[in-house]
UniProtKB/Swiss-Prot annotation:
Organism in which the protein naturally occurs: Phocaeicola vulgatus (strain ATCC 8482 / DSM 1447 / JCM 5826 / CCUG 4940 / NBRC 14291 / NCTC 11154)
Known EC number: 7.1.1.-
Name of this protein: NADH-quinone oxidoreductase subunit H
GO biological process: aerobic respiration
Taxonomy, superkingdom: Bacteria
Record has Cytoplasm as a keyword: no
Alphabetic keyword roster: Cell inner membrane, Cell membrane, Membrane, NAD, Quinone, Translocase, Transmembrane, Transmembrane helix, Ubiquinone
Length: 358
């Protein structure tokens, strides 16, 4: 498996050979920031196109086909259309909070996106408390959503924001419990270290029953946390028009839209990192030839392949199941997922203490 840190160390030594180290670090930070923004934009474009095609497939349609080959340039046309739209601020809105809210949501999404270990040595933010930072960064987005609903001075926006806040805060608990189950198994909160521990097998397969239960809980709770169907009640069109971003137009609406899709990718990428081995290839015990071939595939291809498979799975769920009511959503969380998650966590503790894991 290629270690990308060799490249970063070579670039750092090259820059420090003809400039002060402080200036070299500053240039590296700028380059990394630009790369993160470009990767964020590319992921958003792919996710939007994938959503439209997957939706069309489940509805027996073709989806975007007009602009570009097989509709591949349709997303760029939509972005251009959104860029030239006027940004309208409604009367009696709290203009400062109204304009600030989309940037808080997108900032939280970018911070969480920066934590993803795409390849060995290719982590931007790799702390020894990476899981803690990831959960903290992703939870900031609910502040922007609540501000968007409150500052819009619109009852539909406010109801959508309150629904979203209640839903996100509730399901954050189940997400944390499912991740904590694997943290107990690995005895580390560093994302890259969790991936390294899966070199001899993904936790979904070698973590016993608690890992499988935690994976299922994580998919359900993660889907609800990013307000995806069937948990998309905060923006239920039949009740609340567009929910908390009803009064937003132009690129302000575009920021909410992009953040929603990238947050879906982040949920899938974290599932890949924690349960599906991250950048680790698929190894089958006893098949050394097959395993050797799998090792030739670059780690980032494994990471993105697994992540987009989980994304497709979540999109499948969205376009298959009907929307739940708010009482059903909260009942599912507090009466079922949380108790099951706590019992599952206790079961994992017993397995680790008595060394019953593989």
């Amino acid at each position: 498996m290629f270690d990308f840190s060799i490249v970063t160390q070579w670039v750092h030594s090259l820059l420090t050979s003809f400039m002060p180290e402080e200036l070299a670090v500053l240039i590296e930070c700028i380059v990394i920031g630009v790369c993160i923004m470009l990767a964020y934009a590319v992921i958003a474009i792919i996710m939007i196109f994938m959503e439209r095609k997957v939706c069309a497939a489940f509805q027996c349609r073709l989806g975007p086909m007009r602009v570009g080959p097989q509709g591949t340039i349709q997303v760029f046309a939509d972005v251009f259309k959104m860029l030239i739209k006027e940004i309208i601020t409604i009367r009696h809105a709290d203009k400062f909070l109204y304009n600030l809210a989309p940037y808080i949501v997108i900032l939280a999404s970018i911070m969480a996106f920066s934590c993803l270990p795409i390849n060995k040595g290719m982590e931007v933010l790799d702390f020894n408390v990476g899981i803690f930072f990831l959960l903290a960064a992703s939870s900031i987005g609910v502040v922007g959503i609540l501000l968007a609903g409150w500052s819009s001075n619109n009852k539909y926006s406010l109801i959508g924001a309150m629904r979203s806040g209640a839903q996100m805060i509730s399901y954050e608990l189940s997400v944390g419990l499912s991740i904590l189950t694997i943290v107990i198994l690995t005895d580390t909160m560093q994302l890259s270290e969790i991936v390294e521990r899966q070199a001899d097998g993904w936790f979904l397969f070698k973590g016993h029953i608690p890992a499988l239960i935690a994976f299922i809980i994580y998919l359900i709770a993660g889907n609800a946390e990013v307000n995806r169907g069937p948990f998309d009640l905060p923006e239920a069109e039949s009740e609340l028009t567009a929910g908390y971003h009803t009064e937003y137009s132009g690129m302000h609406f575009g920021l909410f839209y992009v953040a929603e899709f990238v947050n879906l990718f982040i949920i899938a990428a974290v599932a890949t990192t924690i349960f599906l081995g991250g950048w680790m290839p698929l190894h089958i015990p006893g098949l050394d030839g097959f395993n050797a071939i799998m090792d030739y595939i670059p780690g980032f291809i494994w990471f993105f392949g697994k992540s987009f498979f989980v994304v497709w799975l979540l999109m499948w769920i969205k376009w298959t199941f009907p929307r739940l009511r708010i009482d059903q959503i909260l009942t599912l969380e507090w009466k079922y997922l949380v108790p099951i998650g706590l019992c599952n966590l206790l079961l994992m503790v017993i397995i680790v203490v008595f060394k019953l894991h593989f």
